[in-house]
C-alpha cells in the first residue's frame, strides 16, 4: 500500500511518530531501510526464497502468512506446482518494491514534516528575536536614563558635599572669636561658677573618702561587732517608736475628723437657717419698702395739698381784707331797701375764691351787723343751692334782672362781696337748715388721689403683719364704709360758722374733701351725684389711728 493510497487517519499516527522522533533516530531508520532493501534484493536474486524484512506499516502479507492463510486448498497447489516458484519470486519482488516505495514515501513525509517544523521554529525564533531586540532597546534606553539620573545625583551629592564643607568652614570658630568668647563677662561668670562647683565637689569627695576609710573595720574586730549590735538595737527601737506614733496619730486624726464632720454639719445647719432668715429679711425689706413708698406718696400728696391750701388761704385773706375795706364804706341806696344788682363774677374771681377762715368771718359779722341791709332774701339766696343739670353753672339771685339800675359802683361792690355765688356741682339730696347768719360758702374743686401700692409677694414670716400694704380693692372697701358713715350723719352742704362745732371730729374728717378741718373750723364739703362725700378715707383713717395712739388707745388694725 502506497502513501498516496493511505487515508488521513492512517497517516496521522505516522506523522505523530515522526514528530516525536529525534533527528538521529530518523537518520538511523533511513539507513536501516536502505540496507534492508539492498540485502533483500541480493537474497531474492540468489536464493529466491528468502523472507524480506517487513516495514513498520506494510499492509501486504508475507509469503509465510499466505501459506498459513490457505491450508484448506490443497487441490490448487498440486494443480499449479509447476507455476509456484516464479510467481513467488515475482510476488516477493513486488512486495519489496512496495516496501521500498512505502519507506521512501514515509521518509519524504517525515522530511516534509520536519521541514515544516523547522520553518515554524525559524518563524518563532525570528519573532522572538524581534521581541528581544525591542526589549534590548528599551533596556538600553532605560539604562541611559538611569545613567543620566545617576550622574545628576552624583553632581548634586558633590554640590552638597561642597556646601557642607563651606558651612563647616564658616562655623569653625576662629582665634579672634574664641578670644571674644573668653572676654565675654557672661561666659566668664559661667566659668567662675563651674570652677567653684568643681572645687566644692572635690572637697566633698575627699571628705567622704576620709570618712569611709575611717569607718572601715575588719569582721573580726570587737569594735565593729559592738557597732553593728548597737545599730540593730537602734533600728528596732526606731520601728517601735514609729508604730506608736503612727497609732497615736491615727487616733488623733480620727477624732479630729469626727469633730470636723460634726462642725461642718453644724455650719451647714446654721448656713441653711441663715439663708432662710436672709430670705425672710428680704421679704420683710420688700414689704417695708413698699410701705415706705406708699407713705412717701401719701406724704407728697399731703404736702401738695397743704401748699395749695396755704395758697388758697392767702388768696382768701387778701380777698377778705378787700371785702372788709369795701364793706366799711357806707352803702348808697335810692330811698328803698332794694340793693343794686351785683356784678356777674368772672371765672378768674371764681377760681381764686375758696373756703374762708371762720374767725375772720365772725369778726366781719361782729363789726358790721347790718351788712345785709335788712334784706332776708339775700340770706335765702346765699343759703339755698339750686339743683342744676350743668356742673359749674353760676347761680345768681332772683333779683338780678329786677334790681335798680341806678345803683353806684360802691353798692355793687358791697353787694358782690355779700352775695357772692360760687361754682358748685349738681346735688340730688338738698339739706336746708334753719336760717342762720350766713357765711361765705366756698367750694373747693379737689380731686381725691388714690395711690395703690405695688403688688409684691406676701412675706412668709414677716414681722410687719400689723402694717400690711393696701391694695385698690381695700381702698374701695374703706371708701364705701366711709360713705356709709357719712350718709348716717346728716351733714349740711352749707354750714354756718357756728354750726361747725356740732359735727364730730371723725365725721368731719371723713366728710371733708380737703385737710382744711385741721387748720380751721369752717367745713365746706364737696357734693357728689349721690349726695355723699367721698373723701380720702385712707388718710383720715391713719389720722384717727394717730389720734387714738396719742390719746392712749391701741393702734388701729388694718388687717380687716
From Swiss-Prot:
Residue ranges, compositional bias (Gly residues): 42-52
UniProt subcellular location: Nucleus
Coiled coil (UniProt feature): 87-218, 262-324
Biased composition (Low complexity): 87-107
InterPro entries, alphabetized: WTAP
Biased composition (Basic residues): 69-83
Superkingdom as given in the UniProt entry: Eukaryota
Basic and acidic residues bias (residue ranges): 316-325
This protein's UniProt keywords: Coiled coil, Developmental protein, Differentiation, mRNA processing, mRNA splicing, Nucleus, Sexual differentiation
Any one Gene Ontology cellular component term annotated for this protein: nucleus
GO biological process, alphabetically ordered: cell differentiation; mRNA modification; mRNA processing; regulation of alternative mRNA splicing, via spliceosome; RNA splicing, via transesterification reactions; sex differentiation
Quaternary assembly: Component of the WMM complex, a N6-methyltransferase complex composed of a catalytic subcomplex, named MAC, and of an associated subcomplex, named MACOM. The MAC subcomplex is composed of Ime4/Mettl3 and Mettl14. The MACOM subcomplex is composed of fl(2)d, Flacc/Xio, Hakai, vir, and, in some cases of nito. Interacts with vir and msk. Part of a complex containing fl(2)d, Sxl and vir.
Family designation: Belongs to the fl(2)d family.
PANTHER family found in the cross-reference section: PRE-MRNA-SPLICING REGULATOR WTAP, WILMS' TUMOR 1-ASSOCIATING PROTEIN
The protein's name in its UniProt record: Pre-mRNA-splicing regulator female-lethal(2)D
Source organism phylogeny: Eukaryota, Metazoa, Ecdysozoa, Arthropoda, Hexapoda
Amino acid at each position: 500500500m502506497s502513501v498516496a493510497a493511505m487515508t488521513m487517519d492512517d497517516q496521522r499516527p505516522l506523522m505523530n511518530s515522526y514528530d516525536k522522533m529525534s533527528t538521529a533516530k530518523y537518520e538511523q531508520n533511513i539507513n536501516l531501510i536502505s540496507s534492508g532493501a539492498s540485502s533483500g534484493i541480493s537474497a531474492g536474486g540468489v536464493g529466491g526464497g528468502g523472507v524480506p524484512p517487513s516495514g513498520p506499516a506494510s499492509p501486504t502479507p508475507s509469503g509465510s502468512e499466505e501459506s498459513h492463510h490457505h491450508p484448506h486448498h490443497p487441490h490448487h497447489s498440486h494443480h499449479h506446482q509447476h507455476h509456484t516458484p516464479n510467481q513467488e519470486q515475482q510476488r516477493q519482488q513486488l512486495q519489496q518494491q512496495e516496501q521500498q516505495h512505502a519507506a521512501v514515501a514515509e521518509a519524504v513525509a517525515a522530511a516534509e514534516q520536519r521541514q515544516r517544523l523547522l520553518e515554524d521554529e525559524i518563524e518563532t525564533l525570528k519573532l522572538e528575536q524581534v521581541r528581544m531586540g525591542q526589549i534590548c532597546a528599551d533596556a538600553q534606553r532605560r539604562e541611559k536614563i538611569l545613567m543620566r539620573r545617576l550622574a545628576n545625583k552624583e553632581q548634586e551629592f558633590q554640590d552638597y558635599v561642597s556646601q557642607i564643607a563651606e558651612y563647616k568652614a564658616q562655623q569653625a570658630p576662629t582665634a579672634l572669636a574664641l578670644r571674644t568668647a573668653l572676654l565675654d563677662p557672661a561666659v566668664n561668670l559661667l566659668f567662675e561658677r563651674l570652677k567653684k562647683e568643681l572645687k566644692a565637689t572635690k572637697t566633698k569627695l575627699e571628705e567622704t573618702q576620709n570618712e569611709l576609710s575611717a569607718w572601715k573595720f575588719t569582721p573580726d574586730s570587737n569594735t565593729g561587732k559592738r557597732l553593728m549590735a548597737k545599730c540593730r538595737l537602734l533600728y528596732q527601737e526606731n520601728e517601735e517608736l514609729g508604730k506608736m506614733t503612727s497609732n497615736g496619730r491615727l487616733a488623733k486624726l480620727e477624732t479630729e475628723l469626727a469633730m470636723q464632720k460634726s462642725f461642718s454639719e453644724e455650719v451647714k445647719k446654721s448656713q441653711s437657717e441663715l439663708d432662710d432668715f436672709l430670705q425672710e429679711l428680704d421679704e420683710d425689706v420688700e414689704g417695708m419698702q413698699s410701705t415706705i413708698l406708699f407713705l412717701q406718696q401719701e406724704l407728697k400728696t399731703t404736702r401738695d395739698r397743704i401748699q395749695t391750701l396755704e395758697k388758697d388761704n392767702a388768696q382768701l385773706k387778701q380777698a377778705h381784707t378787700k371785702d372788709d375795706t369795701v364793706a366799711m364804706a357806707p352803702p348808697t341806696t335810692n330811698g328803698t331797701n332794694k340793693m343794686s344788682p351785683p356784678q356777674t363774677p368772672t371765672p378768674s374771681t371764681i377760681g381764686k375764691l375758696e373756703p374762708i377762715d371762720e374767725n375772720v368771718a365772725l369778726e366781719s359779722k361782729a363789726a358790721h351787723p347790718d351788712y345785709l341791709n335788712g334784706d332776708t332774701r339775700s340770706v335765702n339766696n346765699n343759703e339755698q343751692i339750686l339743683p342744676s343739670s350743668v356742673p359749674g353753672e353760676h347761680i345768681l339771685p332772683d333779683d338780678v334782672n329786677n334790681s335798680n339800675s341806678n345803683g353806684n359802683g360802691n353798692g355793687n361792690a358791697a353787694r358782690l362781696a355779700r352775695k357772692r355765688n360760687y361754682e358748685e356741682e349738681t346735688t340730688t339730696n338738698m339739706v336746708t337748715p334753719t336760717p342762720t347768719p350766713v357765711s361765705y360758702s366756698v367750694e373747693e374743686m379737689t380731686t381725691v388721689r388714690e395711690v395703690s401700692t405695688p403688688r409684691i409677694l406676701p412675706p412668709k414670716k414677716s414681722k410687719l403683719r400689723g402694717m400690711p400694704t393696701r391694695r385698690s380693692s381695700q381702698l374701695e372697701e374703706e371708701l364705701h364704709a366711709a360713705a356709709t358713715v357719712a350718709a348716717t350723719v346728716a351733714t349740711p352742704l352749707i354750714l354756718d360758722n357756728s354750726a361747725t362745732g356740732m359735727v364730730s371730729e371723725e365725721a368731719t374728717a371723713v366728710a371733708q374733701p380737703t385737710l382744711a378741718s385741721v387748720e380751721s373750723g369752717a367745713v365746706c364739703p364737696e357734693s357728689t351725684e349721690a349726695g355723699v362725700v367721698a373723701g380720702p378715707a385712707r388718710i383720715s383713717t391713719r389720722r384717727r389711728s394717730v389720734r387714738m395712739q396719742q390719746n392712749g388707745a391701741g393702734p388701729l388694725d388694718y388687717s380687716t
